[in-house]
UniProtKB/Swiss-Prot annotation:
Family in the record: Belongs to the ATPase protein 8 family.
Species of origin: Patiria pectinifera (Starfish)
Protein name (database record): ATP synthase protein 8
Keyword Transferase: no
Pfam family, one: ATP-synt_8
Self-association state and partner proteins as the record states: F-type ATPases have 2 components, CF(1) - the catalytic core - and CF(0) - the membrane proton channel.
TM region positions: 8-28
Length: 54
């Protein structure tokens, strides 16, 4: 029954693209929060002496 095969193919095709479209729209509508840099941290200024070449 090729009609049933075509019907299942069309159903899966449209369901797949519809789900991808819904996921893409949801991802586009989510707000991206801008995280500010953490200025309270300090960097370590001690030299790294582990890499000594003979």
């Amino acid at each position: 029954m090729p009609q049933l095969n075509l019907a299942w193919w069309l159903l899966n095709f449209f369901l797949g693209w519809t789900s991808l479209l819904v996921i893409f729209i949801i991802l586009l509508n989510t707000s991206i929060t801008n995280n500010t840099a953490n200025t309270s941290t300090t960097t370590n200024t001690t030299p790294n002496l582990n890499w000594t070449w003979n």
